Amino acid sequence: MSQQIRVGERLAQEILMADSQRTALQPDCLVYGRRVRSSGYLLIACLSVFSGGELEAQKPSQAIELTPVGTPELREELFDSIIEMTRRREAWSPFKEAHMGYDPLTEMEALRSRIVNATTEDDLYYGLTLLSNARRDSHLYLTPVPDGLKGPSLPEARAPIQILPDYSDMHTPSFFVSGLDQKHLDASESPGVDRVAIGDLIVSVNGLSIPEFIETFRAWTRHSAPQGLYWRLARDIPIRAPATAPWMYREALDLELEDAQGQRYSATLPYLEPNTVSIELGEAELYPGFSVVMERFNFNVLRPDDGRRVVLLQWLDFEYELIQDVMDLIAYSEAQDLLDHTLVIDVTASSGGSRGAYAIQRLVDRPFRTTFGNLRISDAAIEMIEDWAVEPDRDVPEIFGLNESRSWLHEWAQTSAKQDVEAALAYTRATPFKLAHLPHTSEDGILMPAPVHYTGPIAIIGGPNGGSHLDQFVSMFADNDLAFTIGMPTGGYSNTWEAEETLYFPGTTQPVVQFMWNVGHTLRPNGEILEGNAVQPEVYVPLTRENFRTYHRDLLEAALDRLSRPVS
């Protein structure tokens, strides 16, 4: 077992130092943010504690009629207000910033002129998109609001190919064709499409070399770690995405490629309606010799055709159906006498969600520490805490390992969180993640296995496609020494909560857009901030142009080989 670390011990001093450097407050002035709702719109009032102890709200200027684009002066005030709200609300991850070598507020500030000088709705909307993306957070995005900026108008389209990243050299990543819609390619009269083949290397995208493409489209791609960035860049090469400004695309996708013999050629691929594209993958079969015995919304269950004592879970999601899906898995496993079998969980195709600890309680035979979380105390967090404190408990049945009624969250908001706000702490004290599996009084965060559970050895196959709750799922296995891990790290973008707010031009009733903030840290069972700090697998096997045709079967075989060896 790994060393027992009290959760929160690694909320390093550098976090508070980073926050204090970003929040330039006068020593004797305590600043709060409060949301003031009036006549159906929202304003931000900044309350300062002066020596006399009285609070004064900043009064809005006289409301004027505007268009959603505003004026240069109002756009600059809007920009300043976003920077200030971000400075006081955002839960920064030193791990993420150090790993990617950037400062989010500096990158946001560099976009000032783009916002101020916007002349059209598209200019402003996509400028604000870049402003949001500058924080490099997979969770955060813009949402159009009534009477505000219209937002994306160009529908999504995709070219009839699939692209994957080659991770063999993280300093010079490359991309290659991993799948084709041969029917659409054969029907196309565009030049070069007849030469496109699975495995061909991408040399340029719409005239941009790969380094230029990465540098240009990084700003348009929400990500929290380099592996996730390259995954999403590859995924989106064939896609004309509405969240990216339309002027970033051509009428068709122009690629320069290199074939298996090293010969270069150009191809122009048409953009098509996404639901008409059907991709044939280069990795035609993920798990040869295994057959699906159960299909559920959140995972598929496979067993080997040769009768080996192995259960393979192809994990897909963590949605509400997970409760029943896991019940079905355990009932089937108990009936088939599988609970002592070797368990391999492939999460490379999974997204996020919740209730992962509930599933783990039925997959392991030892107590384990769950993830923890906190909130950075600000106006946004205070409103969330106040709302939870008065929210009624849900009338739902109790389930072992789950608190679906949210009563533990409500109790925390009424007691511990309220005390932390009153004590003017920078962050609330760490509690079991979202109080979904344990109450705030559980300081060690230890969860017990369910009465019926798996008892065999476990391996996790990871990859950068997904993150968020998936990051937590893998970290609970890895940090508690419950499983062998192989493959690549997950996306690394788990947090506790996001705050959303409709932005208005300051002093007016003119809405602009809904903006988001990451307002709390997820803490791994080892006490470290999770965002930008996903589990590094024990055996790192990068996806490459050379191994993609057999990648999953190779990892599965390696995992089974490792689990079959005695542990020294």
Label every model-predicted segment.
Residues M1-R35:
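N-terminal secretory signal peptides that target proteins for export/translocation
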Residues G467, D481-S494:
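Short, well-structured beta-strand/strand-turn elements
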Residues R369, G373-E443:
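Divalent cation-coordinating acidic motifs and surrounding scaffolds
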Residues Y41-V49:
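Bacterial N-terminal signal peptides
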Residues I446-I461:
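Short, conserved helix/loop micro-motifs enriched in His/Cys and acidic residues
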Residues A57-L402, P457-A459, Q472, P489, ...:
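Flexible, low-complexity junctional segments that flank or bridge functional domains
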